[in-house]
Amino acid sequence: LSALEKETGMVMSNSPTVKVGYEVVSELPKEAHEHPMLSLDKTKDVGALVSWLGGQKGVISWKMDGLTVVLTYENGEMIKAVTRGNGEIGEVITNNAKVFANVPHHIPYKGKLTIRGEAVIKYSDFNAINEKITDAESKYKNPRNLCSGSVRQLDNKITKERNVHFFAFNLVDGEDVDFHNSFKYQLDWLEQQGFTVVEHYLTDSSALPDKVREFSEKITENDFPSDGLVLMLDDLAYGRSLGTTAKFPRNAIAFKWQDEIRETTLS
């Protein structure tokens, strides 16, 4: 395994070759984001989604319901993890991110890489954790709240036990890589680096309603919480040229279901 890891340049957090150093900290330091995070504009109307995309190609993906985390890698190694916080300032949780179930500690790419993704706790893990709690009042209300607390632990041994998964959904900074001016290419490239990437598809306005329907049909069987979809322009240069409003980036939009389709049962 060590030889394979050396050959690929990829070492996952759950690899037996990784010696995890558990650490207890007194507080989580706060840090300003190099690239502030704006919220997305939202719609519940598929027609509005189609109009928004117009003649462009877009990438549609899950809007996962956990805690957004920004990971930074340098020289192939994770050097920092920060929560979204208020979009301007987040909490540094590097020790905790290193024990997420599926995050690579080392990647083949050696330049500076900054990515965003969602830390989530799967329904199956959420239910298993709740089953061990006998007092009904003490049970966790939903996977999102449990995930938020798990990611922001002062003791990363607890984070490890909660089996937090990370799904990459955006590449913020990757120097000296030709991404062919394509957001889809960026996501596929992240997958090649060893990241679990949010499920996504390239689409156009004519295929978009069917894609939305296909996603909606998967909700009840998904093992991870989501609260809608995200549609992002595939053309990176065009997306950047649109800039932002005071509140939202113009290169992406969120689609919310009319009602939450999957409910978590507390027993």
Residue spans for each PLM region:
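RNA/tRNA-interacting regions in translation and RNA-turnover enzymes
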Residues: L1-S267
